[in-house]
A protein has these predicted regions:
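Short glycine/proline-enriched coil/turn segments at helix->beta-strand junctions
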Residues: 27-28, 56-58
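A short glycine-leucine-enriched loop at secondary-structure breakpoints
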Residues: 79-88
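Short pre-active-site segment immediately N-terminal to redox-active cysteine/selenocysteine motifs
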Residues: 35-38, 89
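Typically the conserved alpha-helix immediately C-terminal to a functionally engaged Cys/Sec
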Residues: 41-57
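The canonical Cys-X-X-Cys-His
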Residues: 39-42, 93
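Eukaryotic short linear interaction motifs
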Residues: 40-41, 69-73, 102-103, 112-113
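N-terminal leader/targeting and pre-domain segments
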Residues: 1-30, 64, 86, 92, ...
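Thiol-based oxidoreductase modules, predominantly thioredoxin-like and allied folds used
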Residues: 34, 57-77
């Protein structure tokens, strides 16, 4: 699986405030998968994230594409390191509740790990 499909939404830099919070979905729980197409671990994790998105409609599932030639991708990579200074590589995950970043690390890349991550 190289591309995630709806209901997963691809984010752009314009979807974030200057402080790194989400502009939209302020009343929702959101999980953001930070991924890259060249990343083997991402390729393994994407089907779990896709299934999580399909099975958990109350959660907004978003993704940040961390590779490619689009100028916005470069902005997104810079934004990732601002939002999550501990970012070390792909894949990684962010949790937002009511539009605000929740400082929390995920323990794994499975659908079960994602369920635990949001609770």
């Amino acid at each position: 699986m190289s591309y995630l499909l709806p209901p997963v939404i691809y984010l752009e830099s314009k979807d974030f405030t200057s402080s790194g919070n989400l502009k939209h979905f302020k009343d929702r729980t959101c999980v953001v998968m930070i991924q890259a197409n060249y990343c083997g671990h991402c390729t393994t994790a994407k089907p779990f994230f896709q299934k999580f998105a399909e099975n958990n409609k109350s959660v907004v599932c978003l993704t940040i594409q961390g590779d490619g030639d689009d100028p916005d991708v470069k902005k997104m990579v810079n934004l990732i390191t601002k939002i999550k200074p501990s970012f070390q590589g792909f894949p990684d995950y962010l949790l937002y509740k009511n539009g605000k970043l929740v400082e929390k690390e995920i323990n794994g890349r499975t659908e079960e790990a994602l369920v635990e991550f949001i609770n």
